[in-house]
């Protein structure tokens, strides 16, 4: 996505953040917590990214180019708030804005959750591919799975290692946009019933399957775009 943030000022970014603090979180500056401020500020930064996202989508519709669709089981996209601040070139404005909200960028970034969409080299490589495609201005989408619990966490209890789910969605994730209108059915399990005739072999039929709903979520990222699917039984 192209950078459309040349006109961003501390005043406009502060106004956006206070708007989301009130209408997205239902809080005032006095009643808000640091988590509220992080979420509201993330929405404000996401607004800037969405401006570029919509501009990119419009160019796709007008030009109708051939597109690259990249499928990966993992994406290690990192912490989105920090990534977008630097990618959009609004670090200075962000620091001043958060000072106006009685906090700091360093404090807010402590609440920035890393998406549990992948881990290790495979996920990092997939994200790097998307960044490279976007930097070359090639129309590309990344498709993956929206893991509800992400990568497990390891803790020690009485000298024993315990694995627990990574509840990365417990407080919500401000960077994703659900697209229920594009939900599609996915069939899994079951078995194939073979069918034969005297003249030719007929295709088998699939029975005993279970249907899940694949619900897409879009995550606009500066200079790239990711679509992950959540399955619902």
Region locations from a protein language model:
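A conserved hydrophobic secondary-structure block that centers on an alpha-helix together
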Residues: 123, 128-131
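Residues forming anionic-ligand binding surfaces in small-molecule and nucleic-acid pockets
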Residues: 95-114
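Extended, regular secondary-structure scaffolds
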Residues: 119, 136-220
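N-terminal catalytic cores of NTP/NDP-binding nucleotidyl/phosphoryl-transfer enzymes
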Residues: 80, 116-120
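Beta-sheet entry/capping signal
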Residues: 67-69, 131-132, 137-142
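Conserved small/polar residues in nucleotide/adenosyl-binding loops
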Residues: 224-231
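Extended, charge-enriched "interface" segments that sit outside catalytic cores
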Residues: 2-63, 67-71, 76, 81-85
């Amino acid at each position: 996505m192209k950078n459309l943030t040349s006109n961003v000022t501390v005043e406009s970014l502060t106004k956006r953040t206070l708007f989301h603090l009130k209408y997205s979180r239902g809080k005032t500056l006095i009643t808000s917590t640091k988590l509220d401020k992080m979420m509201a500020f993330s929405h404000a930064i996401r607004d800037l990214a969405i401006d570029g996202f919509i501009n990119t989508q419009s160019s796709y519709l007008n030009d109708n180019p051939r597109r690259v669709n990249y499928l990966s089981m993992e994406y290690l996209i990192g912490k989105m708030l920090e990534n977008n601040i630097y990618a959009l070139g609004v670090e200075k404005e962000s620091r001043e804005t958060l000072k106006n909200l009685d906090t700091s960028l360093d404090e807010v970034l402590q609440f920035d959750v890393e998406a549990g969409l992948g881990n290790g080299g495979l996920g990092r490589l997939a994200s790097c591919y998307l960044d490279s495609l976007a930097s070359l201005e090639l129309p590309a989408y990344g498709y993956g799975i929206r893991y509800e619990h992400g990568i497990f966490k390891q803790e020690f209890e009485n000298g024993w290692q315990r694995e627990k789910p990574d509840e990365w969605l417990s407080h919500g994730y401000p960077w994703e946009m659900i697209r229920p209108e594009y939900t599609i059915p996915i069939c899994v399990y079951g078995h194939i019933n073979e069918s034969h005739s005297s003249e030719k072999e007929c295709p088998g039929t699939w029975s005993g399957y279970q249907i899940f709903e694949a619900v897409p979520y879009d995550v606009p990222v500066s200079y790239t775009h990711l679509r992950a699917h959540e399955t619902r039984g």
